[in-house]
Amino acid sequence: MSGNTGERSFADIITSIRYWVIHSITIPSLFIAGWLFVSTGLAYDVFGSPRPNEYFTENRQGIPLITGRFDPLEQLDEFSRSF
């Protein structure tokens, strides 16, 4: 026989009016906040990733791929100078 922990059952929670009043506001708000975070470009600034139009510049059209096994630091320096 299982004991009672005093917690409400999941079915009781999701059928309550209070749950839906709270979540009908918070879930769309989180979605809108995430959409604004990405669409305004703030996500690019916060995480430091390049914007889609900044991957390839006029000077650098190739992929920055390290091909040398024994001189990777030289290639990294060369790539960083092109930024």
Curated annotation (Swiss-Prot):
KW Cell inner membrane (keyword) present: no
Protein's name in the database: Cytochrome b559 subunit alpha
Function: This b-type cytochrome is tightly associated with the reaction center of photosystem II (PSII). PSII is a light-driven water:plastoquinone oxidoreductase that uses light energy to abstract electrons from H(2)O, generating O(2) and a proton gradient subsequently used for ATP formation. It consists of a core antenna complex that captures photons, and an electron transfer chain that converts photonic excitation into a charge separation.
GO MF entry, a single one: electron transfer activity
Transmembrane annotation, as ranges: 21-35
Gene3D superfamilies: Photosystem II cytochrome b559, alpha subunit
PANTHER family: CYTOCHROME B559 SUBUNIT BETA-RELATED (PTHR33391:SF9)
Bilayer topology annotation: Single-pass membrane protein
Name of the coding gene: psbE
Keyword terms of this UniProt record: Chloroplast, Electron transport, Heme, Iron, Membrane, Metal-binding, Photosynthesis, Photosystem II, Plastid, Thylakoid, Transmembrane, Transmembrane helix, Transport
Family: Belongs to the PsbE/PsbF family.
CC cofactor note: With its partner (PsbF) binds heme. PSII binds additional chlorophylls, carotenoids and specific lipids.
Record's GO cellular component terms: chloroplast thylakoid membrane; photosystem II reaction center
Superkingdom field: Eukaryota
Subcellular location: Plastid, Chloroplast thylakoid membrane
